[in-house]
Amino acid sequence: MSLKILFCGDVCFKVQPEVDREAAKRILAPMRDILCAADLRVMNLECPLAPEGVGAPIYKSGPNIIGRPRNVGFLEAAGCDVAVLANNHIGDYGGDALTYTLGVLDEHSIPYVGAGENLDEAYSAYRIVRGGVSLSILAVCENEFGTASGDRSGAAGFDLERLGDKIEEEKEVSDFVIVVFHGGCEYNPLPSPLCRERYRTLVRLGADAVIAGHTHCMQGYEYYHDRPIVYSLGNFLFKWDKPSRPSWYHGYIAQLTIDAESPRQLMIRPIPYVFDPDKNEISPLAGDKLEHTLRYIERISLVIPDMDEPTRYYKGWCIIS
């Protein structure tokens, strides 16, 4: 028996605070069959959900982003089984807004991972059994603003030793351990040498898959020691006033298939889509656009295993960016 898990990229409501469950159904209508066909759906919620007057913008570099409690209807309409909160915006309005967000998710029976009222909670794994397969999902982000520490609430900031210990701990109780990582260089279609080595290290420490995002563009994927690493999914729903790059509204869902009878067989299938800001709709690609995008994903994936070429691309990107 196989288990199909969908990993979706960044979901943010900064310029769409009005989105509720009914609006979400319209936004997601073209994606309905894809979402419904999965056994498990995992989405990155990249903003707190709190009403006006709860929380205040923290001091940070970059925008402070917040959604409203009604926006949880998007996750419900999408059938979200796990909300990933480990990212650089979940703490944008401080601890009170994060606490409110956790309450909203609890009220709507949406499990979450990657943030909490303290560091231990933020690093807690989400465990689930589906189709006779037990999974542990861990989620961490790069150490920017809004991360947890000690008894301070926030997202799970990356700590290799702590994460390695958690992977080992979860391997004792689950068949598969998946790490969702929020990090990378924005708008770069190739992962940095640091990200590549970091995610490969997690596989060597026991992660059965690493699924990453944050770059606001698609990056490729590879199999390392027979384990899939997806370097960036791109945005899923992230409408913006003035997107700075054409890549902003393009992405892919990573469908991870686990064969329960062949534990070494974990397969990734990219499902590309596009968000149309005028129609306010996410649609799977088809025809020539689908073929072109799949070839593009294949091309940017082929260079990843090479030890030298991605480094040369990265250095060039650093110069021109």
Regions found by a protein language model. Name each.
Residues M1-S321:
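Acidic, metal/ion-coordinating pockets
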